[in-house]
Amino acid sequence: MTISILGARVIDPKTGLDQVTDLHLDGGRIAAIGAAPAGFSASRTIQADGVVAAPGLVDLGVSLREPGYSRKGNIRSETRAAVAGGVTSLCCPPQTRPVLDTLAVAELILDRAREAANSKVYPIGALTKGLEGEQLAELVALRDTGCVAFGNGLKQIPNNRTLARALEYAATFDLTVVFHSQDRDLAEGGLAHEGAMASFLGLPGIPESAETVALARNLLLVEQSGVRAHFSQITSARGAQLIAQAQELGLPVTADVALYQLILTDESVRQFSSLYHVQPPLRTAKDRDGLRAAVKSGVIQAISSHHQPHERDAKLAPFGATEPGISSVELLLPLAMTLVQDGLLDLPTLLARLSSGPAAALRVPAGELKVGGAADLVLFDPQASTVAGEQWSSRGENCPFIGHCLPGAVRYTLVDGHVCHGPE
């Protein structure tokens, strides 16, 4: 199919392009930016006056819940939610059932994605077998199958020697290791950030040091091994400072933050609403401000949804007995637009943190607009608004933003030149 997108404000953060112009797509590729190629004839024209055309968003943390947790979601439903939020490429974590630690599971996910996915799916493989922190998974074979990085989720590898050897092995093959830095002992049993709010509510706390202690250890071992490292779900201002110091030393380190950590604080749990039960926990306004500053400066180069859909019953128990997580990929772009609305970021910088930044962090082939490249795009109206939940594709409705009026509205999402979201 050939498509012409006319009169859009085309923003490509990777190249610095920001101008009102046209895009022409042919055979799933970008044929031209600006004037149409000689002999080009569009079978479909999208009039895009007042609309921004940008690289499709790249989300580094989307739990697809398949295999093993179909009551919470599946590849079809959660990638449908992803394209509704402007996401064309996503990474799914290894916490499936069975764990994504073998070729069979990786191939199952990728085969299912080819069959049912609306967006492109890039698995993150398990660093250790069963995420148990003892034996390395088949990292090279998993890479060759299609895994873009490797991690152990929130399950810490307790033995320093085991982790050091794992990082050295990964460095040998130029693999990227994803860390979720939370010390198991300091976080054990915790439900909320350890501070005034947790004390007031009588909830067991998870101190900032649960992140910073684990982060410091991991950074030292990264320095020793030279491995490419990505630190996911940074939650504290001090954690962001440690990342900045590592980058100043020249370590090959990148980081992301969950979008909701840039919006919410531990004050949100005041009413014991399980919709705000997340792991790692929401932290203080000071931490939120520190994270925002790190995003603005580029120390944190990626904003992700860290989408975790749940069935209704998973959030109906008392706070401490509920499952943590927020279903949020469907709102990634409009929620992120609140950062522009608040004056924290300009639009090109926001789009960099949502596309080229995350793509570079995990070397995902996405996040840019170039002639001959894949026609993965999001078209959105920055002046319109989205009422969260009016239309909902994810199986998980565990989202505290449902009912909120958010800035910006996704009009079209295209993957390989095919309209996956928007008017057919």
Swiss-Prot record:
GO molecular function, one term: allantoinase activity
Domain of life: Bacteria
UniProt keyword Chloroplast present: no
Keyword Nuclease: no
Entry's Gene Ontology cellular component terms: cytoplasm
An annotated GO BP: purine nucleobase catabolic process
InterPro entries to which the protein is assigned, alphabetical: Amidohydro-rel, DHOase, DHOase/Allantoinase_Hydrolase, Metal-dep_hydrolase_composite, Metal_Hydrolase
Matches recorded under Gene3D superfamilies: Metal-dependent hydrolases, Urease, subunit C, domain 1
Keywords: Pyrimidine biosynthesis
Assembly information from the UniProt record: Heterododecamer of 6 active PyrB subunits and 6 non-catalytic PyrC' subunits.
Function text: Non-functional DHOase.
Protein name: Dihydroorotase-like protein
Organism: Pseudomonas putida (Arthrobacter siderocapsulatus)
Gene: pyrC'
